[in-house]
Amino acid sequence: MCNNNNTSCVNISSMLQPEDIFSRRCIWVNGPVIVGAGPSGLAVAADLKRQEVPFVILERANCIASLWQNRTYDRLKLHLPKQFCQLPNLPFPEDIPEYPTKYQFIEYLESYATHFDLRPKFNETVQSAKYDKRFGLWRVQTVLRSELLGYCEFEYICRWLVVATGENAEKVVPEFEGLEDFGGDVLHAGDYKSGERYRGKRVLVVGCGNSGMEVSLDLCNHDASPSMVVRSSVHVLPREVLGKSTFELSVTMMKWMPVWLVDKTLLVLTRLLLGNTDKYGLKRPEIGPLELKNTAGKTPVLDIGAISMIKSGKIKIVAGIAKFGPGKVELVDGRVLQIDSVILATGYRSNVPSWLKENDLGEIGIEKNPFPKGWKGKAGLYAVGFTGRGLSGASFDAMSVAHDIANSWKEETKQQIKTVATRHRRCISHF
């Protein structure tokens, strides 16, 4: 029916119910289907391209790296030096600063896609992905919405499935008593762009992770009055120690020292640079920052100026929320704050359980299959960007996934060629 570099429509009617033939187009992919055109998906695709393995990238948005383009605030910079955030086989340009802005990172990702000629199928949302045990193949059902074609349904049939949607696909919005009666502006941090609209306002920031800290700092810089809700203990580290990235310093020390000693060293240096954060309402966990990251996946906050604002009182630390009322919030310690706006820096979660049937991703997850094999599941299922190790970890996983798929693809292709050659010889011998 049709053929191109990445996909070919073939006769697979034996896999379909009669109603499927008329309700959706079925496409055979002679390689993996990659779900997600963010950094993880692009990295896998580029390495597959380099090894001449065909693939298809499915992306629900109308652009690559949609979370970076649509759900990040204007002042955002990468928290780690650029060498730890670049994707495989194409470094950042030399003129990019050590900590690129979000715009520089997006431009880098777009140039990465152009360099490797990666062409995702945009506006195509995966509805379900299920492994067909009878045929040993994945069935990925999608919906395409476009001005040109309107509403179309597709089913991709493939041997390998790469889940690269990441852990931040959907916003986490907790329920709070009385929030519907608050009457003021309520926004998730994923929709926050700048503090300009909050100038002169009293803003409650719910959450004290990296997003909560940066939003609070940005609000201060725009003459707003932020109060940050801190419900649990948190590790705050300086972004740099004596001009060297804290992350890079940690990586270097980990080569020679056990985790507990690296943690001890980091906390001593942090105490010298930031002081005792406990007295400002930021209590530290009993477990060290790296051990906590490894065991619970909780990332430490890298300070870029919020701590000095907390010390000066410009950012106020407050207890957990009891309930909201009209124009106010009551805290668990009994205090009542009059506020104008609420920003929910309450994080994100994966949307994979909603479309990957039978919760197959659980077979890959860090809990059941820890690093370094956390990227590989069963029956040709792979995941990139789910091991909680940021962009550097995702790039490492991407290369592992691409290499593993390429080896399988080349072996299966070789076997198919042998089978065809054997049949051809038989035809000649009977001629």
UniProtKB/Swiss-Prot annotation:
Superkingdom, according to UniProt? Eukaryota
Q: Which tissue types show expression of this protein? A: Expressed in shoot apex regions and siliques, and at high levels in roots. Detected in flowers, stems and leaves.
Q: What class of enzyme is it?
A: oxidoreductase
Recorded catalytic reaction(s): these are:
indole-3-pyruvate + NADPH + O2 + H(+) = (indol-3-yl)acetate + CO2 + NADP(+) + H2O
Flavoprotein found in the keyword field: yes
Stored Pfam families: FMO-like
List the pathway annotation: Plant hormone metabolism; auxin biosynthesis
User: Which family is this protein grouped under?
Assistant: Belongs to the FMO family.
Q: What induces it?
A: Up-regulated by drought and by abscisic acid.
- For the ligand (FAD), the binding residues are G36, A37, G38, P39, S40, G41
Q: GO molecular function terms here?
A: flavin adenine dinucleotide binding; indole-3-pyruvate monooxygenase activity; N,N-dimethylaniline monooxygenase activity; NADP binding
Q: Please report the name of this protein according to its UniProt entry.
A: Probable indole-3-pyruvate monooxygenase YUCCA7
In UniProt terms, what function does this protein have? Involved in auxin biosynthesis. Belongs to the set of redundant YUCCA genes probably responsible for auxin biosynthesis in roots.
Needed cofactors: FAD
Q: What is its EC number?
A: 1.14.13.168
Record-level GO BP terms: indoleacetic acid biosynthetic process; response to water deprivation
What happens without the gene?
Answer: No visible phenotype, due to the redundancy with the other members of the YUCCA family.
Binding of NADP(+), residues:
G207, C208, G209, N210, S211, G212
Answer whether the UniProt record assigns the keyword Ion transport to this protein: no
Q: Keyword annotations for this protein?
A: Auxin biosynthesis, FAD, Flavoprotein, Monooxygenase, NADP, Oxidoreductase
